[in-house]
Amino acid sequence: MSRYLRYTLLTLLWVAVAAYIVFAASAVRRVRRTGTVGKLEIEVVDSSSQGHLVSAAMVRQWISHAGIKTLGTAVDAVDLTGIERLIARNGFVDKTVAYVSYGGTLHIEISQRKPLVRLLTDGMNAYVTADGYVFAAPRASSLYVPVVTGSYRPPFPASYVGSVREHIDLRLGEIDERIAELEREKYPLYRREMENDRNISALRRMRIKRQWWRLEGSREFDARVDALREKKAGLRRTYRYRAGVIREEIERIAGLQEAERRKQKKLEKSYEDFMKLLTIVETVEDDDFWRSEVVQITAKTTPSGALEVELTPRSGRFAVLFGRLEDVERKFDKLLRFYRSGLSSIGWSEYRTIDIRYNDQVVCKK
């Protein structure tokens, strides 16, 4: 085949492809302009054996209550963006895609979030994902996940929906702005302090010279010296008082700033404890034995603000005092060894509490 013929065939092929694309685009525009939606299909793409947070029936109800028209509506008149926003505003929905197929079917694909745990603590009723995203437990939902109860206070309000890290960062930013605002309140005080220091320096330089050209006598000169001393003493007292007042106000503002920084540290610590709580839930869920054995996790906030955990096992009638969420794997290993070497021979109903909070020992109480 000659080079000329080959180029000609390639050109014709590309022309045909371009023509098909133009024709297809025109056909799609015609369908969108004249076609109507004849069918609505809703798919929750990641429903699992644990249950579901969102169902097709729920989505149909949302769309109906919002007044968004679907069936019988012209394809190009369907508010796809509105549908996606309507569904996505529910915190338990991760992603939503809505589109109309060539055949006139409105497809809605929904990906729900995968909660790790449900919080039922201190007025809280929310699901939390492994990466720390919080959302309210929806009505008519059915999903089995571990439940944490108790008096524990999470580092976010009960009505919060969203990333806990983002909430903490927002709070930290607000505190940073408050600290900066307090720092700006110091600026006029610093200027007053510098002015007062200059006055004190000027006061030290104040001297009296004998006025020889006026034939000033010793008595007159001594009188002027005494007057200057009295004036300097009065000014010195005034400047020292001002310096004390200014310094006291600066230290007061600095104290407020330090209090705000303590709030920041407390926020960061509470966030760390919260993520550790998720970690212990993951540890239980990832182990076949502990997933079956631990039936309840009770969390509480101590007077010092620390987080402590208590486990309710399936075996026996005792509670496991787990304590702070440090050395989690070591504590579980210690408890498992005690199960095997202690309780299996002593009996599962002998103790009321098993305390594993302390290093290298298990303390039991009847």
Please give the residue ranges for each predicted region.
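Short, composition-biased local secondary-structure segments
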Residues: 50-58
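Charged, solvent-exposed interaction patches on well-folded alpha/beta domains
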Residues: 1-46, 52, 63-366
